[in-house]
Design a protein with these regions (language model features):
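The feature marks the mature, well-folded catalytic cores of soluble enzymes
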Residues: 1-167
């Protein structure tokens, strides 16, 4: 798939928006518990309220997609090019040599990528369930590079249980 010309260039947060990647809730999943979540939760938050796991209810996905489509329609009125990430079955297990988990979603691409000038930096995630999310922008990545963008990946932590410094 080839997209329209995709020029990457962001030097501030208030210039005219010309293009954007809008996430998707399709196939969203509440991933299995990972003690690394404690790094982004208030102390004891998971102990007080056990996290859900498994597929996000279809009603939530449908309502979220409806809201995202309204956003996309609004952006289209302002001639903003909208790109969307690929999606996967996020219930399937992904792994590294150190761990296995299911995935989460393709809802928040801004969490996984930082744009500075004409460079996109893939940023590491703090949870295993989101560690491989950058591949969902692979079609966009290939097009941006063809159109002159620089694209690098920051080092990714191994996300070992022993690396969890928050108790």
């Amino acid at each position: 798939e080839t997209l329209d010309t995709l020029k990457v260039n962001s030097n501030n947060e208030w210039g005219k928006l010309r293009s954007i990647v809008v996430g998707t809730a399709l196939n969203a999943n509440f991933p299995q518990y990972d003690n690394l979540y404690t790094t982004s939760m208030s102390a004891g938050g998971w102990k007080k309220t056990p996290p859900p796991s498994g597929a996000v209810p279809e009603q939530i996905i449908e309502e979220t997609e409806e809201d995202l489509n309204v956003l996309i329609h609004t952006l289209d009125k302002f001639a903003v090019s909208v790109y969307r990430p690929n999606t996967l079955n996020f219930n399937e297990i992904v792994s590294t040599p150190d761990w296995k988990t299911d995935s989460q979603y393709a809802y928040c691409p801004r969490d996984t990528h930082l744009v500075i000038g004409d460079m996109v930096i893939e940023t590491p995630m703090t949870t295993r369930a989101r560690q491989h999310e950058a591949i969902l922008l692979d079609t966009i990545r290939r097009q941006a590079i063809r159109d002159g963008a620089k694209w690098i990946s920051a080092p990714r932590p191994r996300l070992l249980d022993s690396e969890n410094l928050v108790e």
